Design a protein with these regions (language model features):
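Active-site and NAD+-binding cores of ADP-ribose-processing enzymes
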Residues: 1-24, 55-177
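Extended catalytic/binding region for NAD+/ADP-ribose chemistry, centered on the ART fold
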Residues: 23-65
Length: 177
């Protein structure tokens, strides 16, 4: 069976909701804007991201709908770059250097916060899969420390094979039925 991913907060995946990937505006989180953000689907907890939003981040709960989601699979020829090592981040920073975040400098630049240009990367790949747990375990590079979980970020939704809408309304423990 193909690996399934889930994006929370929308029940449809279309060009109408998709925004072009843009470089990080600052170096506070090093996160780009746009794209389609997702996590691996888990039939018991929906995803690590859903679990994180429900249990850890009440601010996100005010911004995002937790009632709907879309589960999807990727086409076999989808070009997804898996980032799972600190050396790989260093190499990407050399190959796709980014200087735009300096305009919104929030933290001093160090050898621990390497950044690369997501817009340039999107010209070559359909998306990136960030192995957050593998990268952050070493603490050598802190570029992805604020990503919270393993994350799939799609730059191009044409790499999606199919998707299915799901209702993920949490059960109210006070309901009698």
């Amino acid at each position: 069976m193909k690996k399934q991913y889930v994006t929370v907060g929308t029940e449809t995946i279309s060009s109408n909701i998709f925004r072009k990937i843009l470089r990080p505006l600052n170096n506070y989180t090093f996160k780009p804007t746009g794209g389609l953000w997702a996590a691996e689907f888990n039939k018991y907890i929906i995803s690590d991201w859903y679990e994180y939003m429900i249990t850890k981040d009440s601010y996100l709960q005010t911004l995002k709908s937790f009632k709907v989601a879309a589960i999807f699979t990727l086409k076999d020829d989808a070009k997804i770059l898996t980032i799972d090592s600190c050396n790989q981040i260093k190499e990407l920073a050399k190959k796709y250097p980014s200087y735009h975040h300096i305009l919104g400098l929030c933290e001093p630049l160090t050898t621990k916060n390497k950044i690369f240009d997501f817009e340039e990367l999107s010209r070559e790949y359909d998306g990136v899969y960030i192995n957050y747990y593998g990268i952050n375990f070493s603490r050598e590079i802190e570029t992805f420390k604020n990503w919270s979980i393993n994350t799939l970020l799609l730059f191009n939704i044409d790499c999606i094979e199919k998707y299915q809408s799901i209702n993920i309304m949490p059960q109210n423990p006070y309901d009698s039925e």
